[in-house]
Amino acid sequence: MDRCCVDVAAAVQLAAVAGGARRVILMGHSFGGAVAVRVGVGLSETVAGIATFATQSAGCEIAGALGGKPLLLFHGDLDEILPLQASEVVRAIAGSGEVVVCEGDGHLLAKSAEMMMAKLDEWIPATLFE
């Protein structure tokens, strides 16, 4: 996981910050959700918020260090790979955040795409420009 975090942090620094962005939102699915949380802790000045999709909780033990940073966790209630409780654990460790239950959806969250996009369309600007 550490190498993945280094890769994402480098991408944020090179692509986003060098391109003029002051703040970014990180997103990750499954294992990538844990990577996004860890990088969000490490780059706290640059990362405005984190959105995860069916994240695992392993690797998110440091989520408490997010310090109230906006955290949005989508998770299907029928996920057979990582149970909904994984996102609930991450939110509990972080001490804040919102778990959005994607009812009737599994790990890939395919049935919830429109709902998630609508939520992100509101959440991203509110998070970046708060």
Q: Where on the chain are the PLM-derived regions?
A:
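Gly/Ala-rich beta-loop-alpha elbow adjacent to hydrolase catalytic centers
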Residues: G28-G32, A36
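Catalytic histidine neighborhood in serine/cysteine hydrolases
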Residues: A92-L108
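Acidic catalytic loop of the alpha/beta-hydrolase fold
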Residues: L78-L82, H107
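Alpha/beta-hydrolase active-site loop
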Residues: M1-A18
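Short beta-strand/loop motif that positions the catalytic acidic residue
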Residues: L66-G67, L73-H75, D79
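Catalytic histidine-centered segment of alpha/beta-hydrolase-like enzymes
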Residues: D105-M117
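A conserved short beta-strand
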Residues: E45-S57
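Short alpha-helix in the alpha/beta-hydrolase fold that links the catalytic acid
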Residues: P83-R91
